[in-house]
């Protein structure tokens, strides 16, 4: 049975704990608590919770449970951490692609890989690269960020800023106008548009309370709302919905879009003049390892290369491929990719996410803000040659992020388009990026006016006579050198915008009650595959819902406080001042602790 | 204050401990970091890594030493554990030959995951158990020489050679880093541990109170 009360954590159970603190709640972890050998002499033969798969959700869950006091055995069938969130070397990707195409990795299909001979036997080695299977960005004000700080997992990681969000429109990449100051100073924006934009930004920061404004549009699309209610023009509507909101298509409903636009604006200027962060050395793969380490410090046991064969809900015994067994007193949690053979309860993964990851031999620093190595490019519906209906998002990371060596760059393209159209859209986006880059790199010759001339529409023309070769020859010579191209389709049960909907786990709960004779996975709970969402927003929600199913309540989810120096526990909870700085650089706003930001129009 | 900016040191070295379970890694860590003589009273900045600040050439060097958190038991140490490490100590138990034989495994795992320039020391711990010795000193010394590792036998129990082992490693790292900085004509002496790695973009520190417009681009990685 579940015990709703909080059990003492591993740290609390240690005798040394009580000499450090009188007050067991909130949990205070003494210095070096984790380094006292927390492990029993042999493999545990009984645990509270067994988790299979070391992806983001499972790892956050493992850490939350370990610190809550549950005895956790966390396994992965792979010889690396991360599962669906893994950050892999090129050699690991090669093996993974083979496994996908053999059908031994469920939830992925249609993996196609090109690797240049320059990697492995040439100038780059396989481990110079860290490729994420589901890359993510971290908003500066988000539930995951506050958990990272609370759990101190952020200390295992290094973060860099991401401030450049480009929108692709009319064959060029517009940099986003996202701060109040930028809106004011933007020469291209008509006065009326500026006013309307400011009005909208003021509204969106506190949209929920202003039902009279958005409620009439609740069932309509965001573009209707922005056009009719705020008189915004298409470029602004697209920027708001697709680059700031990072939505997937024009049919996005008003509340979802408002939520997502606010996410960006309130994240801006929390840690600096940027809304999002990226972790160095890789994204979810690094974060999940950080949470696994935290779980281990909290007492969880880790085993890789360990495959679950079956779970018997009557005896509560889980059996592994190596013949070992463990009794699980509470729950077995499994990632869909780690489902045992003869499983019958894996939830249907009906939504596709198409991904193309490229490594390009070109530093492409044009995409980045100074000092940064990350950028986001969004291709709104209808912006590509393919006539795309859904957005294509391209997340770009450079060598500064340490996921690729100097002189190279990684492009992560993805779309929520379903079926064969998706690959066409992604290819069109890739081509657009390639063309833009070639234009950029040839513009390096601009100083020599005799060689390069700008045409009326901004295209560079190369004086082929001067170069001693024909223009036709020039173009192929400048073709981008792709070091790596990986195309694959990932399946998930989470539709776009399903992020905060906890009912997805109820599917699993029903399954708990159903017993299918012969199934190897009766009584287990499946986690969700990563969705197409480019932010980490779904992770904490999912982990919390699972946590509640195991512990009975999520009240003490990461309810811990490390004994520490004067450091302020920076929580990611809404803070009025952050709203202020989110869009405001001057001191014209009088904040009285209310989340409502009322910027004065100074036009 | 300078603390807010993480400048209570000149250089920060991440050092990882590896080796089989039960060889005394955690005891070495607490022995070294709890016998503090450093001005930094807040030596522990994590629950499973600890720091001690030393002075070399008038520079304050903060050694941040990480323990495996038990993940070595089934050889499930995360690759992230090795990120940014400039030094490593491979620890075995002189009274347990299997722990010495496994040093090969730990060395290759280290080479696979850590920076190429990582400084490595081999430590034969539990030298107080001389009567139970299973690994001859000479053999380990040869192994260390062949693989260009520092070598010390220590006792975390009676603290013999513990400081010496860490200090030797830290000194070696310092020599590597200062040589590297000289080679580069480097000017960034303000606490980036990765003196040996490629130029990086600035790192955002999440610990300080956000939103005080003070640092967005602080270069302190921890």
Curated annotation (Swiss-Prot), chain A:
Keyword Phosphoprotein on entry: yes
Superkingdom: Eukaryota
Gene3D superfamilies on file: FAD/NAD(P)-binding domain, Guanine Nucleotide Dissociation Inhibitor, domain 1, Guanine Nucleotide Dissociation Inhibitor, domain 2
GO cellular component, one term: Rab-protein geranylgeranyltransferase complex
Biological process annotations from GO: endoplasmic reticulum to Golgi vesicle-mediated transport; protein targeting to membrane; small GTPase-mediated signal transduction; vesicle-mediated transport
Keyword Acetylation assigned: no
Keywords: GTPase activation, Phosphoprotein
Family: Belongs to the Rab GDI family.
PANTHER family according to UniProt: CHM, RAB ESCORT PROTEIN 1, RAB GDP-DISSOCIATION INHIBITOR
Protein name: Rab proteins geranylgeranyltransferase component A
């Amino acid at each position: 049975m579940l015990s709703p009360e909080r059990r003492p954590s591993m740290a609390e159970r240690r005798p040394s704990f009580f000499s450090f603190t009188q007050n067991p709640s909130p949990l205070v972890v003494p210095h070096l608590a984790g380094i006292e050998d927390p492990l029993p002499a042999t493999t545990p033969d009984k645990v509270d919770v067994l988790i299979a798969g070391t992806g983001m959700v499972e790892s956050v869950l493992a850490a939350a449970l370990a610190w809550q006091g549950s005895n956790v055995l966390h396994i992965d069938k792979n010889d690396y951490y991360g599962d669906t969130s893994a950050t892999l070397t090129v050699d690991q990707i090669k093996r993974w692609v083979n496994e996908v195409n053999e059908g031994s990795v469920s939830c992925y299909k249609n993996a196609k890989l090109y690797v240049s001979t320059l990697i492995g036997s040439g100038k780059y080695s396989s481990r110079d690269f860290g490729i994420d299977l589901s890359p993510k960005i971290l908003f500066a004000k988000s539930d995951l960020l506050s958990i990272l700080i609370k759990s101190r997992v952020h200390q295992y990681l290094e973060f860099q800023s991401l401030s450049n969000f480009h929108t692709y429109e009319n064959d060029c990449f517009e940099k986003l106008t996202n701060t109040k100051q930028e809106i004011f100073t933007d020469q291209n924006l008509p006065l009326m548009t500026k006013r309307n934009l400011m009005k909208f930004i003021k509204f969106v920061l506190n949209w929920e309370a202003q039902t009279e404004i958005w409620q009439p549009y609740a069932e309509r699309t965001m573009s209707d709302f922005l056009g009719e209610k705020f008189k915004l023009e298409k470029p602004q509507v697209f920027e708001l919905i697709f680059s700031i909101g990072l939505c997937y298509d024009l049919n996005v409903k008003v509340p979802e879009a408002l939520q997502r636009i606010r996410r960006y604006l309130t994240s801006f200027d929390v840690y600096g003049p940027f809304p999002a962060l990226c972790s160095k050395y890789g994204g979810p793969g690094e974060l999940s390892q950080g949470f696994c380490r935290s779980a281990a410090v909290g007492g969880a046991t880790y085993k890789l290369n360990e495959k679950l064969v079956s779970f018997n809900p009557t005896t509560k015994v889980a059996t592994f491929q190596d013949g070992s067994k463990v009794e699980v007193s509470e729950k077995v949690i499994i990632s869909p990719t780690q489902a045992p053979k003869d499983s019958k309860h894996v939830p249907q993964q009906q939504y596709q996410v198409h991904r193309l990851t490229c490594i390009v031999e070109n530093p492409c620093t044009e995409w980045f803000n100074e000092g940064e190595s990350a950028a986001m490019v969004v291709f709104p519906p209808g912006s590509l040659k393919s006539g795309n209906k859904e957005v294509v998002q391209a997340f770009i990371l450079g060598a500064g992020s340490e996921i690729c060596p100097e002189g190279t760059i990684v492009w992560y393209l993805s779309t929520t388009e379903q079926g064969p159209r998706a690959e066409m859209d992604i290819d069109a986006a890739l081509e657009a990026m390639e063309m833009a880059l070639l234009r950029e790199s040839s513009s390096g010759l601009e100083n020599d006016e005799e060689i390069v001339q700008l045409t009326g529409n901004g295209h560079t023309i190369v004086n082929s006579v001067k170069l001693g070769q024909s223009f036709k020859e020039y173009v192929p010579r400048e073709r981008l050198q792709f070091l790596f191209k990986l195309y694959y389709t990932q399946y998930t049960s989470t539709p776009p915008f399903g992020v905060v909907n906890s009912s997805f786990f109820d599917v699993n709960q029903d399954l708990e009650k159903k017993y299918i004779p012969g199934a190897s996975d009766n009584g287990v709970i499946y986690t969700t595959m990563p969705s197409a969402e480019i932010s980490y927003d779904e992770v904490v929600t999912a982990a919390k819902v699972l946590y509640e199913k195991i512990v009975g309540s999520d009240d003490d989810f990461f309810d811990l406080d490390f004994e520490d120096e004067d450091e302020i526990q920076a929580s990611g909870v809404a803070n009025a001042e952050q709203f202020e700085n989110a869009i405001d650089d001057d001191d014209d706003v009088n904040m009285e602790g209310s989340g409502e930001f009322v910027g004065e129009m100074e036009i | 204050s300078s603390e807010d900016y993480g400048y209570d040191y000149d250089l920060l070295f991440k050092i990882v401990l590896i080796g089989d379970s039960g060889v005394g890694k955690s005891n070495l860590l607490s022995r070294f970091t709890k016998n503090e003589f450093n001005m930094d009273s807040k030596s522990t900045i994590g629950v499973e890594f600890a720091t001690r600040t030393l002075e070399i050439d008038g520079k304050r060097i903060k050694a941040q030493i990480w323990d495996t958190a038990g993940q070595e038991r089934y050889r499930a140490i995360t690759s992230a554990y090795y990120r940014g490490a400039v030094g490593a100590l491979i620890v075995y138990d002189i009274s347990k030959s299997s722990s010495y034989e496994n040093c090969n495994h730990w060395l290759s795992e280290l080479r696979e995951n850590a920076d190429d320039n990582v400084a490595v020391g081999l430590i034969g711990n539990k030298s107080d158990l001389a009567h139970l010795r299973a690994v001859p000193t000479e053999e380990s010394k040869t192994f260390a020489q062949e693989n260009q590792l520092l070598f010390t036998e220590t006792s975390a129990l009676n603290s013999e050679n513990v400081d010496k082992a860490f200090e030797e490693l830290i000194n070696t790292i310092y020599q590597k880093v200062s040589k590297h900085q000289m080679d580069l004509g480097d000017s960034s002496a303000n606490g980036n541990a990765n003196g040996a790695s490629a130029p990086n973009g600035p790192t955002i520190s999440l610990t300080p109170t956000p939103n005080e417009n003070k640092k967005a681009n602080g270069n302190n990685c921890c």
